[in-house]
Amino acid sequence: MKKNIHRCAGCGKTVESEKIVIIDNKPICLACMYGQTIPFEIYPIGQVRNELTMKKKDFGLSGPEGISCIDLLPSQKRFMYKLEEEKFLTIVYYLHKTKSVKSIFKRGLDRKEVGVFASRTPHRLSKIGIQDVKLVKIEGTTLHVEGLDAVNGSPVLDIKLKWSDLSQ
């Protein structure tokens, strides 16, 4: 089986597809992006279930807003102790539909030209999304939440109590 090979726009080395990221429509190898840092694995604890999808063009999501379900793996039940007593949570999830990154673009919120770190774009190098949500109810290991902007099928990495709720 033939592997796709790309020439890095940063250093000129040839690398396999799985060892590059596309930034501003140019292949950049992981060595140019991350230097000597050591990659690590993160395992999902569940998955988002809703009707949201990424828009084909422009910015944002498409689909009905409202309640999303977070289907946690059965193994996560033990970590849900007294979760139903909380009103607001922070959901950390993986932006699994992101294909490429633009370093500078017009922000969807106000069309201001900004870099990735000055935005909420899903097109990020880390592919990590974070969203505060309202907990509506829990059924077994399924959380029903309001305000989640993750698309259907997004792997959930972590759930935390919303920070501002700790200070009240």
Please describe what each predicted stretch is.
Residues 1-129, 141-168:
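Mixed-charge, low-complexity intrinsically disordered regions
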